[in-house]
């Protein structure tokens, strides 16, 4: 085993361990903000695995789209919408965790069986190199144009939903419920109010 192969093997195990531990943290940690940050580490670990496979374009897309867009959007939504409220205890939580663990172990066994019994295609003798990015672009905007546009629409819908939820938190809904006030009479906070608040924070800093 050469030094380069040994280094690649060490990087693979390190990235795999980071990915697995981060994924477990996303599911098991009670703090949703920590889970969102660990989700970003999972995305970065996947990008590192892509780099080990010489797929630099896919790794860059992973970082730009999932870390730079999706994960940041999730963090903004959590920090804008997150309310400190006590969650109700889920009945039968231990039984649900047990069955969830059984299902996960079953999926793991199935994936391991597929990975060991499938005859995978051999890597070609000539790597694509820089032409790989060109071919990905050609397929992305020709054969896979519809899924590409659908993904962009889903991201746009997620952004609009986060903005709508954040705007709802700025409006006091208690008078509407108690006094039955017409929602049309409620004035939303204006942009000047946000500028005044930001100016005060800047002066305080």
From Swiss-Prot:
**EC number per UniProt:** 7.1.1.-
What PANTHER family does the database record attribute to this sequence?
Answer: NADH-UBIQUINONE OXIDOREDUCTASE CHAIN 6
Binding partners and assembly: NDH is composed of at least 16 different subunits, 5 of which are encoded in the nucleus.
Q: Which gene encodes it?
A: ndhG
Q: So where does this one cross the membrane?
A: 9-29, 32-52, 61-81, 90-110, 145-165
What does it do?
A: NDH shuttles electrons from NAD(P)H:plastoquinone, via FMN and iron-sulfur (Fe-S) centers, to quinones in the photosynthetic chain and possibly in a chloroplast respiratory chain. The immediate electron acceptor for the enzyme in this species is believed to be plastoquinone. Couples the redox reaction to proton translocation, and thus conserves the redox energy in a proton gradient.
What keywords appear on the UniProt entry?
A: Membrane, NAD, NADP, Organellar chromatophore, Plastid, Plastoquinone, Quinone, Thylakoid, Translocase, Transmembrane, Transmembrane helix, Transport
Give the domain of life.
Eukaryota
GO cellular component annotations of the record = organellar chromatophore thylakoid membrane; plastid
The enzyme's first-digit EC class, named in words, is translocase
Species assigned in the record: Paulinella chromatophora
Q: Which protein, by its recorded name, is this?
A: NAD(P)H-quinone oxidoreductase subunit 6, organellar chromatophore
Topology class, membrane: Multi-pass membrane protein
Q: Identify its protein family.
A: Belongs to the complex I subunit 6 family.
